[in-house]
Amino acid sequence: DKLISDAKKFSDTAVVVFSRNGGEGGDLPMDMASYTGGDAGKHYLELQSCEQEMLSMVEKNFKHVIVLVNSSNAMELGFLEDKNVDAALWIGGPGSTGCVAVGEVLCGAVNPSGRLVDTYAYDLTTAPAYYNAGNFTYTSNGEDTSEHYVEYAEGIYVGYRYYETRYVDNETGKCD
């Protein structure tokens, strides 16, 4: 309570940062049940209950709420439609230099005015690639190795390529 009280004395604006790490070598968790703070049945790229509760607490205590999405992975961002979230900015993986630029955006010195080049789905479970994800390791002589791989059964139709192709097929009637 003291921390919130002190922060409110400093500003009526709160900045909330959501981050997700991931990269080469393995897929992201499809069920967060075994992770601290994770929810059974929720995957890594959606908000967990503890994160949603934290966002709600901030919204109740501050007049303005800004959300920063610090992730190179396309998270489910439907929570940004919350009427109490005043602004959102995708900052990717900013590193030390990028954080200076984030500060310039937040104080109004720079207008980011860009557009995302990635497709962000409301529900990642609607994409076929979601069901081919897993924590797979190669085997050698019948033994598991520590080398991971990802199965791309969709070929090149992963991410934006799937959404663009699906949209065109729907619009032209090719998927019937």
Segments (PLM) and residue ranges:
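C-terminal non-catalytic regions of proteins with extracellular/luminal or membrane-system context
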Residues: 1-176
